[in-house]
């Protein structure tokens, strides 16, 4: 038994299933067989929007990396089936994941063959280390082979595994330009995972990706920028994107994006996404964000909360957005 290959950068990576992976696969198979028949049929054509607009269901989710210290309900093999079920219920079309190790991403992709994937392991640019990856529905979007990739948030962004600015670990951002089959519009998607300790690193990381994006997206096509920023809404790294306020060491302001949850729920006090496996709103922090172009209309935005057993130590963040030509 083997898992599929991951990422367009990866050479032929076959995955031999361990006993624990076999248990996971049987659980996922049971979940898939339990779906309604119409959900398992071949993808159907999507009606073209009369006004050329593009409505998209977005989500970002830090998976919590698989490790031997977390057992029982927190073990990956006991969480993955719930995650796949949640993604099916939420009808997610574009998903940004963080912290997923190679086996975790393979488990998800094997259970979601209707999705394409973009991403690499942060340690070697292939399959070692955590992924900051992007899943997208292939029946809805086509990926632009010339505009996709990953960069390391460092002084040497093309060097796999590189780190600078006091990063505790290699950090990276992944992007892909998608073409919407229903409207013909292009959509740039960026997924980022910033450092959890070093503030200068967070600020320099978003600036680096912003510069890269400005070089690629010269036509100012619609943009989604999501991820685990390890920073709240008032943090300079986040405000650089949301308000166009220059971050430390930057002489140029970013054009500014809409933070989807804040757009609809500016005064909601229970907005934490990082919960540390605890049901205590006073000890939860909103570090996971979905940003979109200012021209977009945010139709819905919410934190997908669930009781125990938790899917991760982060709550997923969901947004439904309409982009207009």
Label each region the model flagged.
Residues 23-32:
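Bacterial N-terminal signal peptides
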Residues 32-111, 124-130, 285, 325:
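N-terminal, active-site-proximal structural segment of metallo-dependent hydrolase catalytic domains
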Residues 43-50, 94, 98-186:
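Structured beta-strand-rich core segments of catalytic domains in phosphoester-bond hydrolases
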Residues 56-63, 83-108, 135, 176, ...:
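Active-site beta-strand/loop signature of hydrolases that rely on acidic residues for catalysis
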Residues 60-81, 153-168, 195-198:
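Acidic/histidine-rich helix-loop elements
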Residues 65-73, 97, 144, 199, ...:
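Short, solvent-exposed loop/turn elements at domain surfaces
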Residues 118-138, 154-158, 164-170, 220, ...:
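Active site of divalent-metal-dependent phosphoester/diester hydrolases
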């Amino acid at each position: 038994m083997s898992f599929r290959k991951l990422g367009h950068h990866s050479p032929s990576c076959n995955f031999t299933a361990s006993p624990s992976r076999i248990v996971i696969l049987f659980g996922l198979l049971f979940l898939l067989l339990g779906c309604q028949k119409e959900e398992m049929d071949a993808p159907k054509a999507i009606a073209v929007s009369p006004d050329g607009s593009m409505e998209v269901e977005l989500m970002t989710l830090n998976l919590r990396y698989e490790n031997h210290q977390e057992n029982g309900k927190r073990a990956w093999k006991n969480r993955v089936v719930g995650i796949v079920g949640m993604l099916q219920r939420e009808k997610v079309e574009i998903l940004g994941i963080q912290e997923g190790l190679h086996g975790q991403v393979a488990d998800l992709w094997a259970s979601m063959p209707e999705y394409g994937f973009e991403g690499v392991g942060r340690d070697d640019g292939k399959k070692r280390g955590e992924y900051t990856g992007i899943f997208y529905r292939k029946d809805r979007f086509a990926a632009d082979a010339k505009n996709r990739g990953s960069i390391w948030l460092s002084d040497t962004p093309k060097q796999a595994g590189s780190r600078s600015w006091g990063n505790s670990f290699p950090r990276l951002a992944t992007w892909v330009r998608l073409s919407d089959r229903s409207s013909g519009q292009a959509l740039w998607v960026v997924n980022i995972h910033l450092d959890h300790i070093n503030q200068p690193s967070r600020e320099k990381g978003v600036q680096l990706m912003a510069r890269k994006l400005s070089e690629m997206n010269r036509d100012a096509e619609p943009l989604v920028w999501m991820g685990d920023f390890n920073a709240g809404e008032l943090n300079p790294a986040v405000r650089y994107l949301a308000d166009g306020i220059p971050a430390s060491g930057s002489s140029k302001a970013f054009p500014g994006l809409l933070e989807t949850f804040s757009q609809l729920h500016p005064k909601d006090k229970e907005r934490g996404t990082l919960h540390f496996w605890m049901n205590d709103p006073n000890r939860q922090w909103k570090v996971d964000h979905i940003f979109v172009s200012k021209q977009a209309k945010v139709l819905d935005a919410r934190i997908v909360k669930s009781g125990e057993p938790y899917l991760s130590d982060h709550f997923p963040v969901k947004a439904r957005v309409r982009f207009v030509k």
